Structures are given as C-alpha cells and as structure tokens.
Amino acid sequence: MSSRINIGVRHVLPIYAGLAVIAGVGAATLLRQTAGRWPALRVPLLFGLLGWQVVSGALAHPDYLSYTNEITRGHAENFVAESDLDWGQDMHRVGDFLKKVGATEVAFTPYNVSYLQAGHAFPKVTPSDWYHASPGWNVVSLGGWKVFNHPGWAGQRKPQFRIGRTHWAWYFAPGEEPKVE
C-alpha cells in the first residue's frame, strides 16, 4: 500500500503565503532603497534571484519530493533520511531498472516493506544480508540504510548505479567476491 501523503510539503505549505508577502516587502524595500544607488544592479539582481529559484525547481524535476537544495549537490542522503527522503516515490524506477537489466532476482530490503505490495513490477525479492552483498543484483534503500544501517555492507562500497534519488544498486557476478571500496 503506498501513501500519497507528502509530509514535507504538507507542513511547509501554510507558511508559503507569509514568506511570499515578506519576500515582496523585501523586494519593494530593496528597490526603493537602491533607487539612487546602483540603478543598473537592482533589477538584474532581483531577476537573478528569481531565475535561481526557477532553475533550482527545474533541476529538481521530477524528484520534487526528495529534493532538498543545492547544498546537498544531489546527495540528500548525506543530510537527511527517513521520510524526509524516501516515501516510496522511486519504487517504480527500481522495478523498471531491474526489468531493463533483466534481473530475475534481487536482494532488497526496502525502507518500508509495504512498498513491495504496491503493484510495482519486481522480480523475485529476497531480503538483503546485513553482512554481505548477495550474488546478482542488490538494491539498497537510502532511507533504510541511513536510519537502520541495513544492510551494513552498503556503506563500504561505492554504488554502481543510482536509481532516482533514493536507491543504490550493485551487480555482483556469482562467485565474484564483492570488493570493499
């Protein structure tokens, strides 16, 4: 069962109106105070700030739910975890990725196991081993890894693939000893 609740936006939306008023007052004050000084700078500065917001939103597309800001440089898992990052929004991408690579089985323990029952196209799923990567495909939910350190081996290996913003994947050929990096 998946959830359509967006906990981050749900709690922030009520303050947007107040922030917009404050930003408008600030912009008007800035324009008034700089009317005699730096006249060539004030309008480009305001359009630059507005453009920054537009570009920031466009770069986050379509991952608005897991977007944080430019400081994270696309690695929000280094700053936030749990429901701040993963609401199951990338589960369809995980299923599509596994189908694309022809996986028939995957070692995977999602942050919320009910995500597997939400109708996503997955091959056979076996629980991840905490100590060792399994032969074949391994997928790690960043939310589960950051909150529960499960699986423990994930932090010792650079991911081979990033699926959306909330999952990592590796492939280890049968008989191959996964290397610690």
Q: Which residues are covered by each model-predicted region?
A:
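C-terminal luminal/periplasmic domains and tails of membrane-associated envelope-modifying transferases
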Residues: 69-181
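Signature aromatic-anchored transmembrane alpha helix within multi-pass, membrane-resident enzymes
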Residues: 26-63
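Helicase-core coupling region on the C-terminal RecA-like lobe
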Residues: 57-75
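Transmembrane-helix signature of polytopic, lipid-linked glycan biosynthesis machinery
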Residues: 1-8, 58-61
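Conserved short-loop catalytic and cofactor-binding motifs
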Residues: 2, 11, 82
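Hydrophobic/aromatic-rich transmembrane helices and adjacent perimembrane loops
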Residues: 5-30, 170
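Alpha-helix capping/termination and helix-coil
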Residues: 18-22, 31-34, 52, 98, ...
